[in-house]
Amino acid sequence: MVVKQQKDASKPAHFFHQVIVIALVLFVSKIIESFMPIPMPGSVIGLVLLFVLLCTGAVKLGEVEKVGTTLTNNIGLLFVPAGISVVNSLGVISQAPFLIIGLIIVSTILLLICTGYVTQIIMKVTSRSKGDKVTKKIKIEEAQAHD
């Protein structure tokens, strides 16, 4: 009697297979980048694409988890080229340091404000869709306190 082994979906894929999956996602994202009318980095498109593939189940977590963890653990090494390009651009930075610092501060504040608003919107939408009992209870208590 021959027993066929079924491939377990939760079993992690071979490391090389995981590298191929991530490389294909990056390749497709670079193709998408070349057709985009606005400049957007291929790596950002790849992150969104991989997220969508994971959410839809087209790619299983086990197919990218080990390589993804390895890349995340060594992310400092991946920023070395960006750091070197900043050092090479010190001449440009030294021409308008206050402008650059101001832009960094303003963009950080805008990012925090936008993140807060988006978080509030998401929390409202999810509480409405689930019919959150805690939210209803708080609203009832607030209404009684005002009466």
Swiss-Prot record:
Keywords, ordered alphabetically: Cell membrane, Cytolysis, Membrane, Transmembrane, Transmembrane helix
Compartmental location: Cell membrane
Membrane topology designation: Multi-pass membrane protein
InterPro entries, sorted: Antiholin-like_LrgA, LrgA/CidA
GO annotation, cellular component aspect: plasma membrane
Example GO biological process: killing of cells of another organism
Keyword Ion transport on entry: no
Residue intervals passing through the bilayer: 12-32, 35-55, 74-94, 98-118
Annotated family: Belongs to the CidA/LrgA family. LrgA subfamily.
Function according to Swiss-Prot or TrEMBL: Inhibits the expression or activity of extracellular murein hydrolases by interacting, possibly with LrgB, with the holin-like proteins CidA and/or CidB. The LrgAB and CidAB proteins may affect the proton motive force of the membrane. May be involved in programmed cell death (PCD), possibly triggering PCD in response to antibiotics and environmental stresses.
PANTHER family: ANTIHOLIN-LIKE PROTEIN LRGA, HOLIN-LIKE PROTEIN CIDA-RELATED
Full protein name: Antiholin-like protein LrgA
Source taxonomy: Bacteria, Bacillati, Bacillota, Bacilli, Bacillales
